[in-house]
């Protein structure tokens, strides 16, 4: 990512569009002058990318609203399992948000952190046994095998709640979260403001979907 970002700077591009935390960090570190528009970052501030030439769209969701919707489906839910990649900053932020929201609603979070796909089957098996429902965060590792996780939830007759619309396509029962296609369109509008309308990124506060 750093090499690509530096190449863009060398080529003197008009703008850099960065998707996800690591690529946005590389872009932000590579230049103070070229506008950088990001998307699919949960916590831009913690990622250290908020500079005068950087703006974009965050995918951080209202987890408490999500849990409230889940409880409307089944008010008996007391334990929610979550599996996530502990090496992914976005995922750790989401799990922290999940714990905070759960404590406010009297729910216990059962978490399993993984760092590679091969760990997910066993972690999923454990979670469906120890929890009443599963919460799927917007996590790249989880997304790569979401069908595997939801199949185990369905087999155990447990609800799988997705934090993004793609999770439902992967077998989750319900979602109230991010549509990354729409996020891309919103990022495109910011790009137009900068490239066509002459706005400075510092004039455009980053926003959430």
Task: Please provide the spans of the model-predicted regions.
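Short hydrophobic alpha-helices and adjacent helix-cap/hinge residues
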Residues: 1-209
């Amino acid at each position: 990512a750093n090499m690509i970002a530096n190449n863009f700077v060398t080529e003197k591009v008009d703008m850099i569009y960065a998707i996800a935390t690591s690529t946005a960090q590389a872009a932000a570190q590579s230049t103070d002058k070229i506008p950088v528009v990001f998307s699919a970052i949960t916590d831009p501030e913690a990622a250290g990318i908020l500079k005068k030439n950087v703006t974009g769209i965050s995918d951080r969701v209202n987890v408490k609203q999500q849990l409230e919707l889940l409880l409307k489906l089944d008010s008996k839910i007391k334990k929610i399992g979550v599996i996530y990649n502990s090496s992914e900053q976005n995922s750790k932020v989401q799990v922290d948000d999940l714990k905070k929201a759960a404590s406010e609603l009297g729910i216990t979070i059962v978490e399993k952190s993984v760092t590679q796909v091969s760990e997910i089957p066993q972690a999923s098996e454990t979670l469906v046994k120890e929890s009443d429902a599963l919460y799927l965060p917007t996590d790249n590792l989880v997304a790569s095998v979401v069908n595997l996780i939801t199949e185990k939830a369905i087999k155990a007759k447990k609800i799988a709640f997705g934090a993004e619309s793609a999770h439902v396509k992967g077998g989750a029962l319900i979602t109230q979260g991010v549509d990354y296609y729409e996020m891309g369109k919103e990022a495109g509008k910011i790009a137009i403001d900068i490239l066509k309308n002459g706005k400075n990124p510092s004039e455009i506060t980053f926003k959430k979907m």
